[in-house]
Amino acid sequence: MTDGAAKPQADGKQPLLARMLSWLGASSTSAQTPAPGASPVARARRSEADAAPVIAPLDRMTVAQWLWGDGFIMPGDANYVLELVKPFGLSPAMSMLDLSAGLGGPARVIAQAFGTYVTGLERSVERAKRGMEISVAQNLSKRAAIGHYNPETVELRPNGFDCILGRGATYSVVEKERLLRVLFQGLKQRGQLLLNEFTVDPAHAERPELAAWIARETYPPVLWTINQYSDCLTSLGFETRVVEDVTAQYRSMIVTAWERMLTEVDIKAMARNHKMTIIDEAERWMHRLAALQCGALRVFRVYALANKPAR
């Protein structure tokens, strides 16, 4: 299923970032007229001319959890994750690998719901450390262990996992084929792989919205088309069962989460530097939304089986 490109917003509302700046009073408190063409963040910063006390910075991971839930740092709450992994048919006898563990929220939710042993791997050292600390505090250090890894060099124990989940786990990996081969080797015979992944639509690859999003990412994206993923998985021995465009759902989750946070969190009462952290985060997500909206960036769900000979 496809959405097409460059559609106007269906709800007719003004852009989310513009509404956020309005909430913060950016347009009415400016002490200095912003230069023409200044970015929304620059305009907001100019508007905060009054002096503010020095307050410890607001952690980006705190903002992420306001958006997505405790222990969650990307679109998709606990209910979404549990629905996503339904095809796995998880049980206490099974083992699962999460390649985008973040702070470990998804791994812990899955472990608690199904009794499955989940290994969570996270590219950020700090997030992995904090995620494991939370698992320990919740007595889930064994069933939802979180550790750091480098996806460019990771190795897995052969035939070690029944299922592997990756949400945005490969789009910034340079050696994608190598990583997918490692995943194939790490799965048991008829083991299951589920990817929710960013891809590029070659017809819109030169769009400036895509370039702007790429420039803001922590790990530079090296995007494949969905056909490249399909061809690579087949060549490695995977049997692909589902390829579904879930871009519209992903966009909707982003907008809904920001709408909710603007309602539930008293941003106006925050210190200036905390407001700026939220606006910076909003601008990052607006770049992602723009790349999705113009059709250059797509999100696909891919479900495949490791078609290995029986041992």
Where do the model's predicted regions map?
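N-terminal auxiliary segments of SAM/dcSAM-dependent transferases
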Residues: 2-52
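Class I SAM-dependent methyltransferase SAM/SAH-binding core
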Residues: 97, 106-153
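Conserved Class I S-adenosyl-L-methionine
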Residues: 242-311
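A short glycine-rich, Lys/Arg-flanked "PGG" loop and its adjoining helix->strand segment in the class I
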Residues: 177-192
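Conserved alpha-helix/loop element of class I SAM-dependent methyltransferases that forms part
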Residues: 74-92
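Short, glycine-/aromatic-enriched active-site segment of Class I SAM-dependent methyltransferases
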Residues: 198-220
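Conserved class I S-adenosyl-L-methionine
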Residues: 93-102
